[in-house]
């Protein structure tokens, strides 16, 4: 029972910490833009600050995850992130939001991300990596959908019955309620994390062991291939942030219905991630990823051409939900490549930090690029160009998977160093 309680805790912590910086923009983008008075370009630049700070934090975060208790690292991160929401609720300007997102780039990554990945890998064991990461991603999807549904209810509560008649003040009040919901959720989850995660940590016997992983992983081709896969997959995930805006500007929905469409998509996440995890364990994580990229290439190409008229509307909805499934399938298994690539367990944090450092660089470039794509051609033209950009990224992902498969045919064990002297000790209070 405690084993599954641990995974449930990791699931909720792993999703709630990203609620403030990402859920607010993914599910409520039209409302956020109106409430803050931002353009797509300005919001994209704010996200670029987050991405820059996160990129700096990923690699040292991996080293810390190999040294310190996941319980301590996750708890501090959740509290620090939740506190930042109280500042967001004051509606700072673009500079204030840029500083806040830079702060979140540190609080959500430095002490959190690699620790989460390491804890999940250890939970799964060598035989069930696809299942472990599939359950993590799928469970995070359930948590995201549940909190998005609750947040939509909060937004609707404060909005007038006819959302199109909402005043600026009503919209700001409603969105403030959404922000505070995610803030308190992060803090409450921090308390649960401290109570439910065992207080164990890994302790090295010298300063050499602290930086040993950082020194060796950068020369491993398999690490770079996995990082490139994450870049392409994460662009697809970031692409989901546009769907609520697409629903409003192209499909003619109001803000609440646009947010609801994205929330419905989030409910696909657990099914897609868990299914992909089981397939990866029985078949291959890399081949599962290749199939997912192929599906995305087709769906993005269709969305770049489809018009919301007659049967075209059905084509759009079908491809939207298929793309949700393929993106979440990718996220469910790309960290299972740690085991498929035979990554030594003592280097899990360092490799996770390295592939995240490189793989999540779309946090820096994706939103500024796509924000400018949308603003350059307002309306359906901008959104079609947006999907065309995503199709190109998916095609690149297919080629990267082919490269990874070729690397895996070599003797991967020979590419890794031997384990330095490390001990396991319980955390002292």
Annotate each language-model stretch with its function.
Residues 56-69, 272-285, 374-375:
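Helix-to-loop junctions at the C-terminal end of transmembrane segments
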Residues 1, 198-226, 422-429:
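Juxtamembrane intracellular "pre-TM" segments in multi-pass secondary transporters
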């Amino acid at each position: 029972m405690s084993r599954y309680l641990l995974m449930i805790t990791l699931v909720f912590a792993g999703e709630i910490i990203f609620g403030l910086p990402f859920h607010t923009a993914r599910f409520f983008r039209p409302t956020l833009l109106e409430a803050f008075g931002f353009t797509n370009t300005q919001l994209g630049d704010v996200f670029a600050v987050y991405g820059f700070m996160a990129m700096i934090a990923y690699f040292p975060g991996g080293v810390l995850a190999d040294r310190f208790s996941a319980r301590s690292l996750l708890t501090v991160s959740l509290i620090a992130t939740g506190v930042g929401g109280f500042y967001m609720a004051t509606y700072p300007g673009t500079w204030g939001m840029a500083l806040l997102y830079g702060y979140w780039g540190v609080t959500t990554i430095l002490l959190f991300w690699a620790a989460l990945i390491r804890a999940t890998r250890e939970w799964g064991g060598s035989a069930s990596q696809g299942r472990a990461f599939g359950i993590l991603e799928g469970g995070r999807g359930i948590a995201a959908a549940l909190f998005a549904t609750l947040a939509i209810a909060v937004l609707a509560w404060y909005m007038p019955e006819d959302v199109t008649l909402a005043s600026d003040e009503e919209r700001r009040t409603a969105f403030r309620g959404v922000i505070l919901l995610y803030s308190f959720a992060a803090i409450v989850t921090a308390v649960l994390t401290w109570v439910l995660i065992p207080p164990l940590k890994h302790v090295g016997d010298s300063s050499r062991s602290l930086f040993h992983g950082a020194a060796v992983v950068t020369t491993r081709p398999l690490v770079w291939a996995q990082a490139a896969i994450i870049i392409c997959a994460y662009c697809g995930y970031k692409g989901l942030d546009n769907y609520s805006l697409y629903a409003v500007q192209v499909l003619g929905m109001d803000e609440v219905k646009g947010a609801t469409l994205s929330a419905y998509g989030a409910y696909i996440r657990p099914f897609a991630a868990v299914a992909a995890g089981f397939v990866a364990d029985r078949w291959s994580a890399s081949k599962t990823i290749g199939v997912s990229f192929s599906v995305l290439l087709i769906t993005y190409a269709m969305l770049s051409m489809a018009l919301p008229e007659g049967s075209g509307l059905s084509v759009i909805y079908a491809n939207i939900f298929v793309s949700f499934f393929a993106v979440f399938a990718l996220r469910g298994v790309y960290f299972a490549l740690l085991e498929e690539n035979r990554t030594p367990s003592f280097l899990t944090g360092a490799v996770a930090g390295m592939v995240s450092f490189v793989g999540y660089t779309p946090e820096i470039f994706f939103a500024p690029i796509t924000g400018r794509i949308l603003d350059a051609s307002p309306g359906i033209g901008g959104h079609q160009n947006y999907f065309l950009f995503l199709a190109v990224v998916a095609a690149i992902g297919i080629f990267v998977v082919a490269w990874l498969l070729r690397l895996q045919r070599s003797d991967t064990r020979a590419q890794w160093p031997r384990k330095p002297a490390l001990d396991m000790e319980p955390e002292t209070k």
